[in-house]
Amino acid sequence: MTKENNAINRRKFTTGALALAGASGISLTALAQKPGRPEKEQIKLGFIKLTDCAPLVVAYEKGYFEDEGLNVQLEAQANWKVLLDRVIDGQLDGAHMLAGQPLGATIGFGTKADIVTALSMDLNGNAITVSNEVWGLMKPHLAMEGGKPVHPIKADVLKKVVDAWKKQGKPFKMGMVFPVSTHNYELRYWLAAGGLNPGYYTSSDISGTSKADVLLSVTPPPQMPATMEAGTIHGYCVGEPWNQQAVAKGIGVPVITDHQIWKHNPEKVFGVKADWAKANPNTHIAVLKAMIRAGQWLDASMANRIEAVKMLSKSQYVGADAEVIGNSMTGTFEFEKGDKRPAPDFNIFFRNYATYPFYSDAIWYLTQMRRWGQITENKPDSWYLDVAKKVYLPEVYMQAANALVAEGKIKATDLPKTDGFKGVQSGFIDGVDYDGRKPNDYLSKFKIGLKATDKV
C-alpha cells in the first residue's frame, strides 16, 4: 500500500512556539533544535484492524505523511504480539499499539524491550459484549426505563449469572485482546467493581487466572465474535467494530462502553523502539505531525468522520461493513438490537488533548499491572513516575505539535498547559478517584486487587 508520487508536497519542518512550551511546563531543550529532513524517508508502520487505527489511515489517505517528506507503507498485523515483535526486530518502524504495550515491554512483562511513545492515538473506543445466552440471564435483573435497560450496566448483575454457573460447576469465560491491553484492564476493572475477581498473574500462572471467578483469555480482535458464537467464550472486551459486529450478526449484546467504565480513558498509542527514536528524531517528529493532523481532521466535523468510515471499510484496513463501522465512529452506539443510543465521545481522536502523552495515563496502566500481579512486588511512587518518564515522551510530542502551530495547522489552544499530569480524575464506574501522583494510595482503595506488599 505504498503511496504513489510520494515526493509531492514535501516540506521542511519549522520550529515551534517556545513560549507556549514554557507555559506548558515542558522543557525547552528538546524544542530548541530545528528539525531537519527525515533521516529515513521510506518507513513501514503496522496496525491492527480496528477503527482506532484511523489516525494512521487518515494520515496516509489524506497525504499528511507525504507533506512531511515520508513514503509510508501501512501493513495490517495478525495480532498484538506479532505487531510488537516486528517493531522490536525492526521489520516495522513503528506501530499502532495498545497503551500498555510500551510500558509492559519496558518493565519486562512478556517480551523485554525499550519501547517509547510520544503520541496517544485516541480516547475511549472499547466495549464489553456478552453472548445472547448470558444477556438473557442478566436482563431480568436490570432496572428498566421506557422498556430499555438503564445504563451503565454494572457487573453486579453479571455476578448473579457467574455465581449460578459456579454452583453448577460451569466456568465463566471471557476474552480480551492481550495481557497488557486496555481491554484487559478495563474488563478486570468492571468485573472487580461488581465483586468478581478476574484473577491474578503469578510466576506459575502467566495466564492471569489464579483465584479467578471469571476466566480471561486472549483472542485477536477480529476473531472475537466467532469465538463467542462457537461458545469458547461467553463475552469479551474489544474495540470496534467487533462489538457492533456481534449486534449486526445477532449473536451478542454490548452491555457497557469503556467510556462508562473510565471517562476519557487513553486507548492506543503510536509506539517505536527507543533506539529507533534516537536514530531517527526527524522522522519520528514527521510521523507525529502527520498523525496529530489526522486526529484533528477526524474530530473536526461529522463529514470527516463519514469520509473516514469509508476509508476504514476498505479491505486493506479494517475491512468491515461501513454501516457497522459507522455506528460508533459517527457518534452512536447500538446495545441490544434496535437500542441505539447517542455516544458522541465513543471515539475521540483530538478533543480533550487526546493526542498528548500524559505521564498520569502511563502511571494508571502501571497501577493496574501491579493490581493484578503483572508487577510482582511493591514499588514506591517514584518508581511509577520514573517508568512513565522513560516511556512517555511529551517533550517530543510538543516539538511536533508546536511545529504545526507555527505552520498554522493547529491552534496553540489545542495543546495542554501541563507538567504531564492531569488533575485528580473521577468518572470511574466504582466511584474511586485517581491521582497519578499517588499510585500506591490509589491501589489501597480497591477491595479486590494487590496493594502494598501483597502477594498472591
Predicted regions and their residues:
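Hydrophobic alpha-helical segments
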Residues: L20, A32, W372-T376
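N-terminal secretory signal peptides and thylakoid transit peptides that target proteins
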Residues: T2-A21
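Short, glycine-/small- and polar/acidic-enriched structural segments
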Residues: Q33-S217, T227-H264, D430
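Secondary-structure end/capping motifs
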Residues: A279-E395
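Conserved C-terminal helix/tail region of periplasmic/extracytoplasmic solute-binding proteins
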Residues: I363-V456
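Pocket-lining segment of extracytoplasmic ligand-binding domains
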Residues: T202, P222-F333
